[in-house]
């Protein structure tokens, strides 16, 4: 038992009581008075009214303790003694309790062991019961559920799919049972679940086939049950593809019947909407007829794809996942065993749409070929070619480049273009045997058949230009573009016929003018279209350049003949530059002369002895030149009056006039040179005394009389025209 007073409390009180007498006698009286006051204050301020002090005082009171000095000194020891005695008695009592417990344990040990064994057995039994219940609940399917799964009388509803999911899970979990030592249970359960699954898939397959017979794809509210059934059936690829084959055959028949009804308004089985006019009765030309059929096929293809997307792809990749799982579970259905099998949903969808439209494609091809074979209008055929090309690109984007519809559009496009080529060849053959059509017109303009061909070509080029996209414009401007085959059959043969018909004309001038008119007309037609100019403009321009040089020679020769200058040039031919002198062919034809200093031979004085330079002949040429010059430019232009390009005539005439002026300058220079040479000869003869002098005046080496007058003499007097005058009159 603990002490009722804090340890050292008594000593503290006694020290307090004895502290004052211990003060030194030398301490001041004031300090002793303050210490006593502080002590009294401390004692008086202590409170003895709290509960702990009251309880302690009450306990002392009950023990009968007297407040004496001896008692206060022994109180602590007495209390500790009592505590020790109490503790010893408690220990003795607990020892008796321990002995009692040991005896009780010895007596109950067999009972406890038996009870423990029973409890363990109970726990094992409960665990086995739980395992059995869980096994039965998970691996055993009730007869009612199996009836829903396999019976043909039971409907395909949510319960069917729930039971099917459970049986599939049981079949999958049987793999765990096969991992143990005893595999009999797992094998039996797997065999049973496999039979149930096969029966369920067969039931689902027959139900989907039945639903497909009455399925209306035009109805946007397609049953969710059939979509779910297709997703589930996809886990059996063989059944799923058989189902798709059945569906494709049914849709092929339905769409073929619908196409026939759209064409003829005679659907098999029942009447249709009489407000819709059949295509064969509303389309009055081949282009409209083919366009309406293609538009119907395109609209049907889009609708069919959208409906099949809603049926097969609306729920994401569930069908693809199911088929992938089925391919993994049916390895014997793989074609390429060494390759990883993957399912492309979009490709499968496009293939299904292609199969649905097999009958429609066959009917469309037959009708288009019949229409094209019976039509002889090339422009319409070419428009059909572009229409087919447009739908080929459309179906390629919709179903893929290797789809049946895209291939059929390509085949029809090639067939129609071959028909177009055949029509153009027939026209060329007919024209080749029509002599009247090939005869050039009197005005030497382009022939009528060529103008008709260019008119058709313009329509073809406009059709092609309208069909070009912005991304194709640049590529179409290169050589050998898509329009080049058209030009080869619709332009080149007619141009060749027009050029060959020039042989009917009597003279070279008419032939050159006629051929030039043909080429100018052709150039003006194709130059407006870059895709045609890219391949045919350069050859035409080259041919026109050659014809221009020929017309320039003709015009130049006309000026020389009409003016009489040609006679003088012919006489001076021996005074022209030597054959070794290099000059362009055109200058050789035009008779252009190099500068006078390079053309004066040593015997230039003999020019006056030539017949063409005798007085009468030279006066006649000079008079002919004077008569020609006032109307020379108009006459020269009139010489090419049948040429249909005024600018072409002007440029050729101007160059011919320039060549004529150079020829005149050459003749003038030779005449002046001859006079000067004769003057030098006369002077030499005078100095030698062999002659009395000149005819009228003495001519110096400079060709002038001694008195300084500018009087001309000799040939120059007979041929007074100057190059400057000629240029002014012909400007």
From Swiss-Prot:
Residues 1-36, 578-599, 686-714 are annotated as: Disordered. It is found in: Golgi apparatus membrane. GO terms for cellular component: Golgi membrane; Golgi transport complex. It holds the Pfam family COG6_C. Residues 689-699 have a biased composition (Acidic residues). Keywords: Golgi apparatus, Membrane, Protein transport, Transport. One of its GO terms (biological process) is intra-Golgi vesicle-mediated transport. It is a peripheral membrane protein. Signal peptide: none annotated. Acts as a component of the peripheral membrane COG complex that is involved in intra-Golgi protein trafficking. COG is located at the cis-Golgi, and regulates tethering of retrograde intra-Golgi vesicles and possibly a number of other membrane trafficking events. Belongs to the COG6 family. This is Conserved oligomeric Golgi complex subunit 6. The gene is cog6.
